[in-house]
Amino acid sequence: MSKPELKEDKMLEVHFVGDDDVLNHILDREGGAKLKKERAQLLVNPKKIIKKPEYDLEEDDQEVLKDQNYVEIMGRDVQESLKNGSATGGGNKVYSFQNRKHSEKMAKLASELAKTPQKSVSFSLKNDPEITINVPQSSKGHSASDKVQPKNNDKSEFLSTAPRSLRKRLIVPRSHSDSESEYSASNSEDDEGVAQEHEEDTNAVIFSQKIQAQNRVVSAPVGKETPSKRMKRDKTSDLVEEYFEAHSSSKVLTSDRTLQKLKRAKLDQQTLRNLLSKVSPSFSAELKQLNQQYEKLFHKWMLQLHLGFNIVLYGLGSKRDLLERFRTTMLQDSIHVVINGFFPGISVKSVLNSITEEVLDHMGTFRSILDQLDWIVNKFKEDSSLELFLLIHNLDSQMLRGEKSQQIIGQLSSLHNIYLIASIDHLNAPLMWDHAKQSLFNWLWYETTTYSPYTEETSYENSLLVKQSGSLPLSSLTHVLRSLTPNARGIFRLLIKYQLDNQDNPSYIGLSFQDFYQQCREAFLVNSDLTLRAQLTEFRDHKLIRTKKGTDGVEYLLIPVDNGTLTDFLEKEEEEA
């Protein structure tokens, strides 16, 4: 190897040292004493770097700078600096004995490197006369030697040698090495460098695997969150918040401004009807034309009734006026009975009484409803010339939709000289009839949508605008008691019977609680006074009973309904029983 000429006495000399010379420097064979352990040599002097703007460097130079920064940080713990100008040291300073670096220490340094920002250092590789890097073309394309010329009397820290995996990347462009190369390694140096590089590559692979394992322990990678996942997470969180807001336990405040608190007096039924009659209906011409089309069917209906069919009318709107026109037009000379099914006091017994008393002129009594029905059927079968037209408004009303009521009406309509024409308004009205009842009625269905208001049909219902009469609570009694248990209905029935038995007593103020409890206990309806009080509380909530205390402090029970309504209710209960 040619020795470069030294211009000054204190310049650093670079010699090639073989393997034998290295062993002689590590261990003195003659004296048998170990030499002082030194750190690795300095590859680059960071204090002699001439900075250059980053935009002058190319992309390959940027990668070299990143690796040089890593080399600078990894050499922080160098303890001694190289003595400049010492030519007598020879390979002692260049090939010093290195301490074995443990993988744990390198892992700690790597973790510190990941946590702390790196030091930005710029390198000038083109015009720096003190740093010369030669890149010979070897079999693996790695750099063989570096020439470093530090300044005199400068104390600089030495950087530890970087791993081979990083040193392989410290390659400058080919144009730099071609123009600034001073010497090339011989073939023998290439052969020896190949073996050394193979060993260093193996150590570098093991070192990089340990560093990756430590990094996985120190900091776990955070998965990237795509916009779709972020939107789904936000949507889920919003749904959760909406669920808890909807099911929160906070009290919901509602307004207490109801119609009951209006200071205006309630109207009677006639006044309300007069006010509604002054309102002109919309599309009056179209409604009149629609009713005229239905009136053209009257003769057809009469023919079908005489052929053994019965007619049922359905559709939106009240059909009471339509049936009334049919009665006045076609049934003037015929015997007919009109039944208002929407009336709260109507019952099957009242229908049968109307037939026996008004049509058949029978003033006697019957033991039961079935006996009365058999007598009517026999009378119409005996006299075939006797004809009767039954017009029933709202056959599906609350008072007539019972199974027993429908069975009795169906048997009457099955007679060949009794003609039935009825109307229904409930959507589920056909569910009242099974196959047996359908065969008795033998219906012909006609859609007669009139769009007329249900004025008469709803006049008997409870309203906040109209004063109620004494007969109105009967529908309320029926609705409430049908939703109760059989024992509850039996308790209320006992109270009704006792009140009707004492209706002629002017001093009657009600039934005492103790006497009523004794009667319910004898009828096996309750087993304790707590059960009876719980049932009376339900009656009181529906305003079916009223309690008051007498002068003796005893609690008395009273039903605030007129006796006629209570009598009709008991008769209806007996019919359904």
From Swiss-Prot:
Q: What does this protein do?
A: Component of the origin recognition complex (ORC) that binds origins of replication. DNA-binding is ATP-dependent. The specific DNA sequences that define origins of replication have not been identified yet. ORC is required to assemble the pre-replication complex necessary to initiate DNA replication. Binds histone H3 and H4 trimethylation marks H3K9me3, H3K20me3 and H4K27me3. Stabilizes LRWD1, by protecting it from ubiquitin-mediated proteasomal degradation. Also stabilizes ORC3.
Its assembly, as annotated, is: Component of ORC, a complex composed of at least 6 subunits: ORC1, ORC2, ORC3, ORC4, ORC5 and ORC6. ORC is regulated in a cell-cycle dependent manner. It is sequentially assembled at the exit from anaphase of mitosis and disassembled as cells enter S phase. Interacts with DBF4. Interacts with MCM10. Interacts with LRWD1 throughout the cell cycle; this interaction, which occurs only with non-ubiquitinated form of LRWD1, prevents LRWD1 ubiquitination and hence stabilizes the protein. Interacts with POLQ.
Q: Write the record's keywords in alphabetical order, separated by commas.
A: DNA replication, Nucleus, Phosphoprotein
Residue positions, PTM Phosphoserine: S122, S138, S248, S280
Q: Which GO terms describe its biological process?
A: DNA replication initiation; negative regulation of transcription by RNA polymerase II
Pfam families per the UniProt record, alphabetical: RecA-like_ORC2, WHD_ORC2
What would be an example GO MF term here? DNA replication origin binding
Q: Where are the Involved in LRWD1-binding repeats?
A: 1-100
**Name assigned to this protein:** Origin recognition complex subunit 2
Return the similarity comment.
Answer: Belongs to the ORC2 family.
Q: Name one GO cellular component term.
A: nucleoplasm
Entry keyword annotation includes Phosphoprotein: yes
Which positions make up the signal peptide?
none
| Tree of life domain | Eukaryota
GN (gene name)? ORC2
| Cellular compartments annotated | Nucleus
- Between which residues do disulfide bridges form? none
Task: Cite the record's Acidic residues compositional bias ranges.
Answer: 188-199
Asked if the Swiss-Prot or TrEMBL record annotates the protein with the keyword Thylakoid, the reply is no
Please give the residue positions where the record annotates the modification Phosphothreonine: T116, T226
Region Disordered: which residues? 81-199
| Organism the protein comes from | Homo sapiens
Which spans does this entry mark as compositional bias, Basic and acidic residues? 143-157
